[in-house]
């Protein structure tokens, strides 16, 4: 599933081609996504100019003068900017024809993504209750410490909660906890402020590095020009169960938490 770095990579890729462009035509080949594509989407978009392409958590927004399109990539979705004469591919469900002879195409084999229309994106039910962005000034160790008091939740589950902080998916939670030296099953309420400062910094460092490398491609994700991300080559623990820890050479262990793979060093992470 595309996580925050993959979605941010997509935003950076499509924004230069979309911002300031007029949407000449909307093509919906298959409206049956996670939620049905609005039947009147073309009425809202055609003839309108894309003022900005922004990201909030794992959602992308195409902001127009009258409202915004909310796009989620789901499990396997991607947005690509292509030349005007490129034929449509299988699973190209939604397409915007732009005034610069480019097309923005949404491809989603599993159809868990979405295209929605809203006139007030900040108050949309999908957005309004989200926690802070992990790369923003609002997110720090003090924030994690304050929200974690009395929490019996494992810290890995805690930082993956979008009400606490957005965009820390399974891969990046594994990596950040390793860098911070914190065991993924340690109770969130039993972690000190100092250790939360280290964890917040590890989350920022991990996500920033992943964005610079175009995200992590393990199966489905490709960016806006159809190329994979390369952060998988820099992973320290995720997918490396049994390999020696890069810090102490102890074999890394794998457990399941909430039915997700969790890899950690039993010596370095406490």
UniProtKB/Swiss-Prot annotation:
InterPro entries with a match to the protein in the record: DNA_glyclase/AP_lyase_DNA-bd, DNA_glyclase_Znf_dom_DNA_BS, Formamido-pyr_DNA_Glyclase, FPG_cat, MutM-like_N-ter, Ribosomal_uS13-like_H2TH, Znf_DNA_glyclase/AP_lyase, Znf_FPG/IleRS
Source superkingdom: Bacteria
Oligomer and partners: Monomer.
Listed SUPFAM superfamilies: Glucocorticoid receptor-like (DNA-binding domain), N-terminal domain of MutM-like DNA repair proteins, S13-like H2TH domain
HAMAP family cross-referenced by the UniProt entry: Fapy_DNA_glycosyl
Sequence positions that bind DNA: 91, 110, 151
Catalyzed reactions: Hydrolysis of DNA containing ring-opened 7-methylguanine residues, releasing 2,6-diamino-4-hydroxy-5-(N-methyl)formamidopyrimidine; 2'-deoxyribonucleotide-(2'-deoxyribose 5'-phosphate)-2'-deoxyribonucleotide-DNA = a 3'-end 2'-deoxyribonucleotide-(2,3-dehydro-2,3-deoxyribose 5'-phosphate)-DNA + a 5'-end 5'-phospho-2'-deoxyribonucleoside-DNA + H(+)
Zn-finger (FPG-type) residues: 236-270
Residues at the catalytic site: 2-3, 58, 260
UniProt xrefs under PROSITE patterns: FPG_CAT, ZF_FPG_1, ZF_FPG_2
The UniProt record lists the keyword Protein transport: no
Keyword annotations of the record: DNA damage, DNA repair, DNA-binding, Glycosidase, Hydrolase, Lyase, Metal-binding, Multifunctional enzyme, Zinc, Zinc-finger
Cofactor entry: Zn(2+)
EC identifiers of the protein: 3.2.2.23, 4.2.99.18
Keyword S-adenosyl-L-methionine tagged: no
The protein's name: Formamidopyrimidine-DNA glycosylase
Organism: Marinobacter nauticus (strain ATCC 700491 / DSM 11845 / VT8)
Gene: mutM
Bound cofactor: record note: Binds 1 zinc ion per subunit.
GO MF entry, a single one: damaged DNA binding
Function, in words: Involved in base excision repair of DNA damaged by oxidation or by mutagenic agents. Acts as a DNA glycosylase that recognizes and removes damaged bases. Has a preference for oxidized purines, such as 7,8-dihydro-8-oxoguanine (8-oxoG). Has AP (apurinic/apyrimidinic) lyase activity and introduces nicks in the DNA strand. Cleaves the DNA backbone by beta-delta elimination to generate a single-strand break at the site of the removed base with both 3'- and 5'-phosphates.
């Amino acid at each position: 599933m595309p996580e925050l770095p993959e979605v941010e990579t997509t935003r950076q890729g499509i924004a230069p081609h979309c911002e300031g462009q007029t949407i000449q035509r909307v093509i919906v080949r298959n409206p049956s996504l996670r939620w049905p594509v609005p039947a009147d989407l073309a009425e809202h978009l055609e003839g309108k100019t894309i003022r900005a392409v922004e990201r909030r958590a794992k959602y992308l927004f195409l902001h127009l003068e009258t409202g915004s399109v909310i796009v989620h990539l789901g499990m396997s979705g991607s947005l690509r900017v292509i030349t005007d004469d490129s034929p449509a591919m299988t699973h190209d469900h939604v397409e915007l024809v732009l005034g610069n002879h480019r097309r923005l195409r949404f491809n989603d084999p599993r159809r868990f993504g979405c295209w929605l229309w809203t006139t007030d994106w900040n108050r949309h039910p999908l957005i309004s209750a989200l926690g802070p962005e992990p790369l923003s000034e609002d997110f720090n160790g003090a924030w994690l410490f304050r929200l974690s008091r009395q929490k019996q939740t494992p810290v890995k589950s805690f930082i993956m909660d979008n009400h606490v902080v957005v965009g820390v998916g399974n891969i990046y939670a594994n990596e950040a906890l390793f860098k911070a030296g914190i065991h993924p099953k340690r109770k969130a309420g039993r972690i000190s402020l100092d250790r939360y400062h280290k964890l917040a910094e590890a989350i920022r460092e991990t996500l920033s590095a992943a964005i610079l490398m175009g995200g992590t491609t393990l199966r489905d994700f490709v960016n806006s020009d159809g190329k994979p991300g390369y952060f998988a080559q820099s992973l320290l623990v995720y997918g490396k169960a049994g390999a020696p820890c890069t810090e102490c050479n102890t074999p890394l262990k794998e457990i399941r938490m909430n039915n997700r793979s969790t890899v950690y060093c039993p010596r370095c992470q406490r």
